């Protein structure tokens, strides 16, 4: 009988899915096409979070902020999971 090795735990981030709470990763967003197409000074709330990931299409996610502002589409690699106090 073979023994199945236990999965190795890694610190890799969990993949984002619809309904996830997210924030924008400033390092990934800086100098991206999306940031260059926006105002020069990005609002702080996108980096503080949380925003809700309401849709995913290919490499992009639609984020809805808890503010009276329009939803935005950003690349998934520019988003990271939001945690309390992050």
From Swiss-Prot:
Question: Would the keyword Methyltransferase be found if you checked this record's keyword annotation?
Answer: no
Membrane listed as a keyword: yes
Where the protein is mainly located, per its record?
membrane
Which reaction does this chain catalyze?
a plastoquinone + NADH + (n+1) H(+)(in) = a plastoquinol + NAD(+) + n H(+)(out); a plastoquinone + NADPH + (n+1) H(+)(in) = a plastoquinol + NADP(+) + n H(+)(out)
Which EC number applies? 7.1.1.-
Task: List, in alphabetical order, the Gene Ontology terms for molecular function in this entry.
Answer: oxidoreductase activity, acting on NAD(P)H, quinone or similar compound as acceptor; quinone binding
Annotated localization: Cellular thylakoid membrane
Which InterPro entries does UniProt cross-reference here? NdhO
Its topology with respect to the membrane?
Peripheral membrane protein
> Which Pfam families does UniProt cross-reference here?
NdhO
One GO cellular component term of this record is: plasma membrane-derived thylakoid membrane
Task: Give the highest taxon in the source lineage.
Answer: Bacteria
User: In this UniProt entry, which cysteines form S-S bonds?
Assistant: none
In the record, the note on similarity to other proteins reads: Belongs to the complex I NdhO subunit family.
Q: Give the function comment from the record.
A: NDH-1 shuttles electrons from an unknown electron donor, via FMN and iron-sulfur (Fe-S) centers, to quinones in the respiratory and/or the photosynthetic chain. The immediate electron acceptor for the enzyme in this species is believed to be plastoquinone. Couples the redox reaction to proton translocation, and thus conserves the redox energy in a proton gradient. Cyanobacterial NDH-1 also plays a role in inorganic carbon-concentration.
**Protein name as catalogued:** NAD(P)H-quinone oxidoreductase subunit O
The scientific name of the source species is Prochlorococcus marinus (strain SARG / CCMP1375 / SS120)
Q: Which gene encodes it?
A: ndhO
